[in-house]
Design a protein with these regions (language model features):
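Short, flexible loop segments at the rims of nucleotide/cofactor-binding pockets, characterized by
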Residues: 11-16, 58-62, 120-123
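Conserved protein kinase catalytic core
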Residues: 15, 46, 114-116
């Protein structure tokens, strides 16, 4: 059995993301990909460039990822792997997930090493 894997980059500007997504869907269908690896938290602009946590920015990122989850079905029957910002009670995580058409979204890993350095202030968030 041959496993076809698609690895991609997606721009985080909403209009460009729409265009990139259409291209990705066409590619996955044409190549009959079995597995699609998306970038880290792909459905919102990267927010951890600022050291200061902003609840509104975080909420917008979570909402954007939640909205895009329904569109993962566009890539079926491929399995999709990526990460998303998610709330666990009062804590915030960058959670790796696996999605497929049969079982839906499943959390796979909560990122525990969070850098805190210029341009990547994940631990501060």
């Amino acid at each position: 059995m041959q496993l076809k894997v698609t690895v991609c980059q997606l721009r985080d500007d909403p209009a460009q993301l729409e265009s990139d997504w259409a291209g990705l869907v066409a590619h996955v269908r044409a190549e009959e990909s079995n597995l699609v690896l998306l970038p880290e938290m792909p459905f919102s602009p990267w927010f951890a460039t600022s050291r200061r946590f902003d609840p509104a920015v975080w909420a917008a990122a979570v909402a954007a990822h939640t909205a895009w989850e329904a569109r993962l079905r566009d890539l079926a029957p491929a399995v999709v792997i990526a990460s998303r910002p998610i709330d666990f009670g009062n804590e915030r995580y960058n959670e790796g997930f696996v999605w497929d058409a049969e079982m839906g979204m499943r959390g796979a890993h909560a990122k525990t090493f969070l850098p805190d350095e210029e341009g990547v202030w994940e631990a501060s968030w």
